[in-house]
Amino acid sequence: MKILQELPLVERARQLRHTFVEGLDGKHYKVLTFALYDFKPPPEFATHETNVEETNERGGRTVLIQPLIKRFFREDEALAFHQELLEKFDETLRLKAPEKKEAKAGH
């Protein structure tokens, strides 16, 4: 995995960290950690989420593919998971490098 860019945060979207990466499989992903609410929810509700979205090379969604969504009750745990996910991105999502096709001789 290669980090392409730490994206600027959008405060109104309650973003805490937003990272644009390229996986071992050559596809592009956004890793986003954010607060689910702008108010204090009841204690039985998770308050933060980290998710991964598959994107095109410019970071736009072509289809909504989210290979990972995880919710947390504490902001520090969500941010720690975001960092851990970046460190072990390919292993966590079980990404493999694309197979190289050999060129046929004579063509």
Q: Where does each model-flagged region fall?
A:
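Short N-terminal "domain-start" leader segments
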Residues: 1-56
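Short arginine-rich
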Residues: 69, 83-98
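A short, exposed loop/beta-hairpin motif centered on an aromatic-Gly-Thr core
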Residues: 62-77
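Short acidic DE-rich linear segments
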Residues: 104-107
